[in-house]
Every structure is written in C-alpha cells, then in structure tokens.
Regions:
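Periplasmic binding protein-like
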Residues: 1-44, 48, 78
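Short, solvent-exposed loop/beta-turn-alpha elements that line the ligand-binding surface or hinge
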Residues: 16-20, 38-68, 97-129
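Hydrophobic alpha-helix feature that most strongly marks membrane-spanning transmembrane helices
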Residues: 1, 18, 22, 30, ...
Length: 129
C-alpha cells in the first residue's frame, strides 16, 4: 500500500467526510465527555459523527447495553468489547492521543473515579502515615 498525503482546506475535508468521498483521512476525534462511552458513540451506525460509515449490529447492541448498564463490571467489559470491534474491523486507526492529567495534593487520599469518568471528592481525607 502506498499513500501520498495531500493537504486540503478545512472546508474540503469537511465536505469529503460528510459525503464519504475519501479513502483515507486524518482527523481529530474527541469525546464530548470524560468516558469511553462518549468516544465510542461516534461509531454507532445511527450517529451523524460516523464519517467512516461503520455499521455493525453487534457493536450497536453493545452500545445499548452500555447505555443502560447498572453493573459497572459488566459495563466495563462491554466497553472493552466495543473498542475491540472497532479496532479489529479497522473502523478506526488511532495514531496518538492527548490525555487529561490530574493530581491530588500530597497528604490527601481517597479521590474516586467511576467508570463513566466522573470524579468524586467526597471521600478525600488526610493521608495517614
């Protein structure tokens, strides 16, 4: 496979992504929330953000299960399965990522982060030495 990169304007890229007239495109993908579900929703078959036109009923079913999951362990398992489908079927090919860094002041402990990416500081207490 030989690829020749060609620069395009933002308008040309948006048009090509919108109507599917591309073979390979490099674009920034962001989630609207700090949770894997927010990221994965972009490839649901009904999503307008699904520029790759990825369609897989098993993937859509996993997203439905994830959305209604009350058991955090089951939800995380489904998130991993959905991500694996995207990667195995070549719907996405991540090249790099940026991350959100955070830290808790020395001497404190107890911050919690749930499976949806939300932080809870209700249990933060001074660290016992």
């Amino acid at each position: 496979l030989q690829v020749t990169a060609r620069a395009v304007t933002a308008e040309e890229l948006a048009a090509a992504l919108g109507d599917g007239t591309f073979s390979l495109a490099g674009t920034e993908v962001r989630a609207l929330g700090s949770d894997a579900e927010c990221f994965l929703l972009q490839w649901a078959s009904t999503s307008q953000e699904n520029v790759s036109r990825y369609a897989n009923s098993a993937y859509d079913t996993l997203l439905s299960v994830i959305a209604g999951a009350e058991d955090e362990t089951a939800r995380l398992g489904c998130l991993h399965d959905a991500e694996a489908l995207l990667l195995e079927e070549g719907a996405v090919a991540p090249l790099y990522t940026t991350v959100t860094a955070w830290t808790l002041r020395d001497g404190l402990t107890g911050v919690l982060r749930d499976g949806r990416g939300w932080f809870s500081f209700a249990a933060v207490v001074p660290r016992s030495e």
